Structures are given as structure tokens and as C-alpha cells.
A protein has these predicted regions:
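Active-site phosphate-binding strand-loop segment of PLP-dependent enzymes
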Residues: 53-104, 108, 119
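Gly/Ser-rich phosphate-binding catalytic loop and adjacent alpha/beta segment
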Residues: 21-64, 74-82
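Conserved active-site segment immediately N-terminal to the catalytic lysine
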Residues: 114-125
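Conserved beta-loop-alpha segment that forms the PLP phosphate-binding cup at the N-terminus of a helix
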Residues: 1-20, 24, 28-32
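Predominant activation on well-ordered alpha-helical scaffold segments within soluble catalytic domains
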Residues: 6, 10, 32, 59, ...
Length: 205
């Protein structure tokens, strides 16, 4: 999952650009480190690990700092805190701020509004019950446009090589680099089991 988290920042954030990092736990704070590593300017909105984010405060910070993107974690692994995304995503969306959400610990275990998130990050472990080693991402068209407009200083941590890769085909697909194929088969099997049980039943348990 960490590769996906860093790749989202590396691909979307140009040096000097401001990113609002919402943090009420370890992984929320970690986003700020990635922003700094890639030359961005993090503005950290930090609250206690048991507290939710205040949408009004998020709006004020957006108005004050004009960030190109905002990062947050859906479920903080160490505490199990599940953040309510709806209001915060609404505020950020209305302001035109790109949203990056770490859903590594929640995707597959509880509903995640991926259609409202510009980059939603998951991983093969956690709720997918598959071996670790694969990052999963959904990327909006708006986010792809920002990737293409942002100078990419890395290949491995850039999303750009994945632009246009179509996995929904029976034809041979050339991927940007070699994957651990055994993990891909394992993830496919895990997803089949989740779908066979039914997502609503999975969410209930």
C-alpha cells in the first residue's frame, strides 16, 4: 500500500504546490512526509485520533491555503478509526481540490465512495484477505489530467506509465513493469470469494 500512497503524491504534486493533509492518526500524518519528499508544501490539519474532521475547518484551510490536493485516511489501521468522508469530500469537491484517500484498511470491508474520490488507494492485504505486495488505485479523469500536467521525476512512483493501460481485454497487455504474478492470481481469487458471498453480507460481518 505504501507504494500507492507515495505514487499518488509523486504523480499529482509539483514542487512548491500546497497539499492539505488531514491527519488523525499515523498514516494521515505520513502523507505530509511524502509531500515534503517530492517538493510540495504540506499544510497539516491534525486532530486527536478519536476525533472526526470538522468540515468547516477544512473549508477555512482550503480558502486560506488554496491547495491543489487534499489527502486523508478512511480507516486508520492502528486505532480502527473510520472517518466519515461524505461532508469533507463535499467541501473539497465544491472547492475543486483533488482528493487522495487511503482506503487500504477499509476497501472491501465497508462502503467506500470511490466515485467521489480522485485517487482512492487500496492494497491486496487487509479486507481483501490476500497476501501483501500489490497496490490498487482508482484514478479520476481529473486526476489523470493533473498527472499529465505535472513533471514526473520518477518512473516507478509515477502513475503516468499506467495511463491508457486496458486490463479489460482478452488481448495481450504490456504492463509498465513486471508484477508478482502469484499475488495477482491470489488477489483475483480473494475478490471472487468476496463477490460470491456478496458485498452487503461482507460489510455486515
Amino acid at each position: 500500500g505504501i507504494l500507492g500512497l507515495e505514487a499518488s503524491v509523486a504523480s499529482l504534486v509539483a514542487p512548491g504546490e500546497t497539499v492539505l493533509c488531514l491527519a488523525n492518526g499515523l498514516y494521515g500524518e505520513g502523507f505530509a512526509d511524502f509531500v515534503e519528499t517530492h517538493g510540495g508544501e504540506p499544510v497539516v490539519y491534525s486532530v486527536d485520533e478519536a476525533e472526526p474532521f470538522d468540515p468547516d475547518e477544512v473549508g477555512s484551510l482550503v480558502e486560506e491555503h488554496d491547495p491543489v490536493a487534499a489527502t486523508m485516511v478512511h480507516c486508520e489501521t492502528p486505532t480502527g478509526l473510520l472517518n466519515d468522508l461524505d461532508e469533507v469530500l463535499g467541501v473539497l469537491g465544491d472547492a475543486g481540490v483533488l482528493t487522495v484517500v487511503d482506503a487500504v484498511s477499509s476497501l472491501g470491508g465497508t462502503p467506500v465512495p470511490t466515485d467521489r474520490i480522485d485517487v482512492c488507494l487500496g492494497a491486496s492485504q487487509k479486507c481483501f484477505s490476500s497476501p501483501p505486495g500489490l497496490s490498487t488505485l482508482t484514478v479520476s479523469e481529473r486526476a489523470w489530467e493533473k498527472v499529465e500536467a505535472t513533471p514526473q521525476d520518477s518512473f516507478y512512483t509515477s502513475l503516468e506509465p499506467w495511463r491508457g493501460v486496458d486490463l479489460d481485454t482478452d488481448e495481450a497487455v504490456l504492463l509498465p513493469y513486471t508484477h508478482l504474478s502469484s499475488n495477482c492470481y491470489a488477489l483475483e481469487a480473494s475478490l471472487d470469494l468476496l463477490l460470491e458471498e456478496g458485498l452487503e453480507r461482507v460489510y455486515e460481518r
